[in-house]
Structures are given as structure tokens and as C-alpha cells.
């Protein structure tokens, strides 16, 4: 089995090292990841300059681009054979609800999905955790199950693992995406030279975190697995918009 691994935290991140080691138990792993932290890059492709591909001392490849660039470059220009699976992560911090629209971790998996490859995004729901071994083993188990018993194509799974402080999650829940409140306002600051600058504010708190959501599962100690798709069509409004335009 050939597995392509990427992330948005960068090729040097501990989460991707743990993930690559765990997935190495299943087959041949190739790591292609950004040269620096590209969190929040979403599905952006670099179109205004060429990309470079280099190899680090640990054997991982890194690209001066986005997570989407990494997967696109690897699949369409680097690898001699298509990977059987793309796995992105382990992200340092959750990617639940609206996070999935901004997440570079989810975007790397989405690019694999768009290229016809079963893909998984994996995140550890903690900003302070330093041990990614449990999340990496969860990723390995999900990938192994998908390998043994494939789901109907196309496949894009978003996996969030609770921080269990060295213990094990209570189990796994198949969930839908929850929803956050709108983000906090930008933070205004000044440079030492007096220039006004802005920092993007924190993500909003969970607004829809009821039973069945990814937020609820993780908050209660369960791994959340959410099947995703890319079709953004608001099917329920097609008739209403048609009537509106015809009036």
C-alpha cells in the first residue's frame, strides 16, 4: 500500500512525524509537506511563482507552497505511481465545524479526494498537547479499516481525536459538522515604528455542538469521524432562487 502524507503545520511538526511512523506499519509512506506552517491556507494553490521540492535529512520532502500544492505536486508530478491513500495531519488543534473551510489539514486531504484518492484528515483537539502517538494510532486504525473495507468512492473523512492526557478515547462516533459562532474581531496593534497592524481574532465558540456533532463527540472523549464532500450547492434553495429570478 502506498500512502501519501501531508499536513499544514510544516514538515518539521511532531504530528506529521508521529503519523508517518504509525502509517509505516501499513505500507510505503511518502511525506510531502509545506516548508513552514501554513495553517489556515485552506484550498489555495500557488499560481504566481514556481514551486520547489526539497528533501530534508529525515527523508521527508518539503515544498515552498500550501498543503494543497504539496498533494497536487506529489500526485501529478512527483510520484511514479498514484498513492492508494492520502492522509493529512496530525494537526496541532481541532478542525471541527466551520474550521474545515479554513483548514490546510483538511485541504490537503480534500486535494487527494478531488484527485480520486481516498483521503483522511486527522487532528488532535488540543493546542497544548505534545504527545501525538494516540492520534497517530487512531489515524492508522482508520486507514487500515479503509484499506481492508473500502467505502464507496469518493472518500473524504475528517477525524478529530480528543486529548485524553495519555489515555485512550472512549470510542468512535460518526458525526456531522457542528457550527461556531462568528469569529472574534481582529486585534489592532502597533509596530515599534508606530505602524498599525492587525491580527486575526480567535475562532468563535461552538454554537451548534449538540449530540451528533463533531464538537459533542470530542468534548465527551470520543473520536469524531465526519464524512465530507465538496459540493457546496444549497439544494434546498434552488427552487426559491429560480422563483426569485423569474419574478
From Swiss-Prot:
Coiled coil: none annotated. It catalyses: a ribonucleoside 5'-phosphate + H2O = a ribonucleoside + phosphate. It comes from the Bacteria. Its main location: cytoplasm. Binds 1 divalent metal cation per subunit. GO terms for molecular function: 3'-nucleotidase activity; 5'-nucleotidase activity; exopolyphosphatase activity; metal ion binding; nucleotide binding. GO terms for cellular component: cytoplasm. SUPFAM superfamilies: SurE-like. It holds the Pfam family SurE. A divalent metal cation binds at residues 8-9, 39, 91. Keywords: Cytoplasm, Hydrolase, Metal-binding, Nucleotide-binding. It is found in: Cytoplasm. The keyword Nuclease does not apply. InterPro entries: SurE, SurE-like_Pase/nucleotidase, SurE-like_sf. Its EC number is 3.1.3.5. Its cofactor is a divalent metal cation. PANTHER family: 5'-NUCLEOTIDASE SURE, 5'_3'-NUCLEOTIDASE SURE. HAMAP family: SurE. Nucleotidase that shows phosphatase activity on nucleoside 5'-monophosphates. Belongs to the SurE nucleotidase family. This is 5'-nucleotidase SurE. It comes from Azoarcus sp. (strain BH72). The lineage of its organism: Bacteria, Pseudomonadati, Pseudomonadota, Betaproteobacteria, Rhodocyclales.
